[in-house]
Amino acid sequence: MRKYPDHPIVGVGAVIIDGDRVLLVKRAHEPLKAEWSLPGGAVEVGESLEAALVREVREETCLDVTVGPVVEVLDRIGRDANDRVEYHFVIVDYLCRVARGTATCGSDAEEVEWAQRSDLVRYRLTTAATRVIERAFEMRDS
């Protein structure tokens, strides 16, 4: 169960960069339903981080990706109106590149869009997602 968990849930995220663009998905499910974010999701029991990332990206974007280095590890803790922990994820974000396919909306996303780096503010990303994306561009450029 993801809502009101007994322990943190491990998740993965993909920063997929193409030139000066990054791939974003509009989330189809909570938390952050209908918000723009990086493709990714929860790791299943018995699944490696990298395998989970490849699966989640394919489910959300129909792309096959090659998983690169870790960009950042962060936690996302959401509390309800009574200050109870409603969500707690530990997320490992990776820099990825497209191996094959065309980005289209998969089963776990409302929309998929290549966003210009200079235009990220219009997607109203979380502070953490914006930081991870900028760090990924810096890693790619170094």
Where are the regions that the model predicts?
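A conserved beta-turn-beta hairpin within the catalytic core of GNAT-like acetyltransferases
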Residues: P31-A34
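Active-site-adjacent beta-strand/loop module that shapes the phosphate/pyrophosphate-binding cleft
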Residues: L74-T102
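NUDIX/MutT-family hydrolases
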Residues: D93-L95, T104-A136
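Conserved N-terminal beta-strand and adjoining loop/helix that marks the start
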Residues: M1-V22, L95
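The catalytic Nudix box helix
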Residues: L38-V71, Y94
